[in-house]
Amino acid sequence: MNAITIFFIILSTVAVCIIIFQLYSIYLNYDNIKEFNSAHSAFEFSKSVNTLSLDRTIKDPNDDIYDPKQKWRCVKLDNDYVSVSMFGFKSNGSEIRKFKNLESCIDYTFSQSTHSDIKNPCILQNGIKSKECIFLKSMF
């Protein structure tokens, strides 16, 4: 084998490895790709999508949390959805922030609320017997 043959063998091996890495990346993100395609299928033949797309894979508040109890989630409380974790509820000042549907709760929790107030009703005086504190304890 001469040097040119070895060079082309190495080059073809690198090319095959890059293709395998790309296929694996597509495999890992297949659900996100399907979601994007279904959301933008109406714009298939347009020059640009011309809409804002929310990519929750960039920054997620749960990325750096390893304890499942501390992870943020949207759950139903009475007839509304709330953002809850072991720390408490996401709030807008003194009241728990409530959402009419699950999608708006998810959008707020995982995109808009990077630095929002958190209300824990269990640390307030007489809050241990409140409905919100009992609900929070039942979640964990």
Swiss-Prot record:
GO annotation, cellular component aspect: membrane; viral envelope; virion membrane
Name of a matching Pfam family: Pox_A28
Location(s), subcellular: Virion membrane
Record topological domains on the Virion surface side: 22-140
Sequence intervals crossing the membrane: 1-21
GO biological process: membrane fusion involved in viral entry into host cell; symbiont entry into host cell
InterPro entries on file: Poxvirus_A28 (IPR007664)
Main location: virion
Keyword vocabulary terms for this entry: Disulfide bond, Fusion of virus membrane with host membrane, Late protein, Membrane, Signal-anchor, Transmembrane, Transmembrane helix, Viral envelope protein, Viral penetration into host cytoplasm, Virion, Virus entry into host cell
Membrane topology according to the record: Single-pass type II membrane protein
Modification after translation (UniProt): Contains two intramolecular disulfide bonds. They are created by the viral disulfide bond formation pathway, a poxvirus-specific pathway that operates on the cytoplasmic side of the MV membranes.
Job of this protein: Envelope protein required for virus entry into host cell and for cell-cell fusion (syncytium formation).
Sequence similarity: Belongs to the poxviridae A28 protein family.
Record protein name field: Envelope protein A28 homolog
Source species: Lumpy skin disease virus
High-level lineage: Viruses, Varidnaviria, Bamfordvirae, Nucleocytoviricota, Pokkesviricetes
